[in-house]
Structure formats: structure tokens, C-alpha cells
């Protein structure tokens, strides 16, 4: 079956078509085997909080809306979340931005308005949060992580990635390093513990190895496994890279 083939391809089954211990763990996660494999790798690479956000995002329809009649406006609004290095990290920017708005104590109506402003589907954001919570709880029950490590705390304004703070005031210029109070100092320590690009992408590769390709020298096409060919989505931050 496709499910067994997927599991075997991600070392979830052995040559006798029996589930390995890894396969048994993958089967407990209510998501695609490829995404489940990524989630299990997150423990090894110490990036569980970040991968829980990304894995749940990859398991639902993209929360970003791109209506035909306002495509350019939507693209401009989505620039707030863009990460120039990785489309996967853009999911973290969306998640963190939404979490900060929730933490302000906004009403449901205000959150809906915020989503509309940035062309995000509020329904899909809610679906994302629900699946994230489900995956986090399952990961905790499986002993993959702890409650403290599973739930990502959004960076403070001082810790925003440069890509996420586009269009905002240059807060970094306002920071006076010599006058950091204790709260800001603790925030810097938390930021230092945040999983980095390499950790996150090493985990992602365990489930998405078939998506790795070599760019054609004469265009935007890529050659992947078994001679497959694909190209980047035009809305990707890497499309023109």
C-alpha cells in the first residue's frame, strides 16, 4: 500500500515489511508519514518546538490567502512573514506574529480583523493551532519532549528576525545594550536557545529528502530523485534567488 511504501521509504518498515520501532512511533502521529518522520527527527536535532509548528502547518492548507482580485496586495502583506533563507521559517514568523496578537488579549473579532489585514485565514489559523496542540500532546505522551519544550514562546519585539520586522520601526537601533534590564537579559538567553536554521532543516530533510533537487543552470527548474523535475512556487521567497 502507499502507506507501507511511505513508511518503508522513511525507515519505518524493514525488508520483511514489518514496522520498526521508528515505524511504530510514526504510526502514533496523526499526520502524513513524511511529516511524522520529521517530527521524530526533531528530538535528535533539538528543535521540537519549531518543528511542531512547521509540521502542523505542512499538514493543513496554507493559511495565507491570495485572492485573484488582490494578489499584489496580499503578496505585500505577506512580506511581513517572509524569511529570505527559507519558506519553512516563514511559518514560524506567521505563528509568532499571531501568538503575539493573542497574548495582547485581543477579542476573537479583533483577531479576525488582524488576519484579514495580513491576508490570513482565521479558520485555518485556528485549525493550525488545534493540530499543533494535538501533536504537542502526543509528542509529550510519547516521551519525545516535555511540556516546557514543546510549546514555542514567540520572540519579543527585540528578538524579531530581520525579515519579520520589515515595515516596522528599526527597534534594534533603539536598543541600548548597556542599559538592558533583567527582563531583556532573560529574553536574550531564551533567544540563544532557539533552534537555528541548520537544526531545523536537518530535521526537515529526514522526511523531505525526495524533494531535494539540483537547479538547472539555464532556468528555474530543478532535477530531483529518479529524474523528476519541479520548480519553485512563484510566491516563494527563494524564487528569484
Residue ranges of each PLM-predicted region?
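Second RecA-like catalytic domain
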Residues: 1-241
